[in-house]
Amino acid sequence: MRFLHTADWHIGKTLNGFSLLDDQRELFKQIEGVAKAEQVDAIVIAGDLYDSSIPNESAVRVLNNMLKQLNLTDKFPVLAISGNHDSAPRLSTGADWFSFQNFFLQTSLEGAFNPVVLGNTQFFLLPFFGIQTVRNYFNDPKIKNVDLAMQRIVAEMKKAFAPDKKHVLVAHFFAAGSKKTADSETLIEVGGLSPVSTETLAPFDYVALGHLHNKNALHDGRIKYSGSPMKFSVSEAKQEKGMWLVDTEPFQVKWIPLKPVHDIHLLKGSFADLVKDAAQQPTDDFYDIELTDKGRIPDVLNRLRAYYPKIVALHRTVFAQMIRNQANAKRAQAAPLDLLTDFYSETTGDQLSPTQLRVAKSTLSEIEGRK
């Protein structure tokens, strides 16, 4: 079995007001081209097909056309799950008959325990889930974090393992290294915050993950993030984007890079130097610019946009350093809950839910009481 592992398409996403739909259409052609050239048996999309739970009409049309092209025209089996940015009910509309065309779209926990069998491989499609959903499914209030939830889920999936097949998990969550020791009190494991241990995922021959946009977020030969296929923020400017080509027998994983349609560049310099060097820069790419000038420059953003039309952020070095110093000082004095919420937001791009906040406060209070 040979398949492509991709994730986090975020169709409909914008970059500081700039639509990325045209770039996403062009990038899709690269993905399709690789699938054809490598003669893959299937294409796996590990969640976050859309950027919003309520995508606009253009985003829906673009994704529908992409999936129809891969599945109906090119005849590739497609295996996909809903991510935290997707609306499972909306995404699952039509899923009952999609499978008759070898388009397997899983949006419910219950369906994750029925593997899709293609060739020598069983694919277990596990959509993004909340802790409470798993507690309710197993009627087990002792499930208090994501790793415990996954331990129950994996144990249930193993009941369906066919001994003569390879076993692939497709999922959308935060995975990290080995489990911490039981006496560690520095690790705050909050519902939805704690990572899934790689040890929990050991029964699978390969784990195709989505959620984190950097393929280097986890270094494991058989448990991998594909990362997003394109750069969606300035923080991803230096990341290489692409997807994994996976062979299950003999097992082999190969990284397939994708070329940015319009790249994101980080530029730093004086106004004069930026204007002088503009001719050497691609006009249609995106730019994050840090100005080193100390004096005031009237209408600087519009003047720079005459040379760099797609400026997504503009900073002044003197102010940027001041902001960094203030942020460091604030962080040093911040309460543990504030640090936790900031970390979660920076890591996942989402805010803590009311339930997560409540559990976080309770856990922190318990830790404080042990001191």
Where on the chain are the PLM-derived regions?
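Conserved beta-strand segments of alpha/beta enzyme cores
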Residues: 2, 77, 104, 122, ...
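Accessory, non-catalytic peripheral segments of nucleic-acid enzymes
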Residues: 37, 42, 247-371
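A conserved active-site cap/scaffold subdomain adjacent to cofactor or substrate pockets
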Residues: 198-201, 205-260
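Short, conserved loop/helix-junction motifs that constitute active-site signature segments
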Residues: 72-74, 162-163, 199-203, 280-282, ...
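Catalytic-core regions built around general acid/base machinery
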Residues: 62-74, 193-204
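His/Asp/Glu-rich metal-coordinating catalytic cores
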Residues: 55, 79-208, 212-219
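N-terminal active-site segment of His-dependent metallophosphoesterases
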Residues: 1-67, 75, 169, 357-366, ...
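Divalent metal-coordination and catalytic microenvironments
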Residues: 8, 28, 43, 48, ...
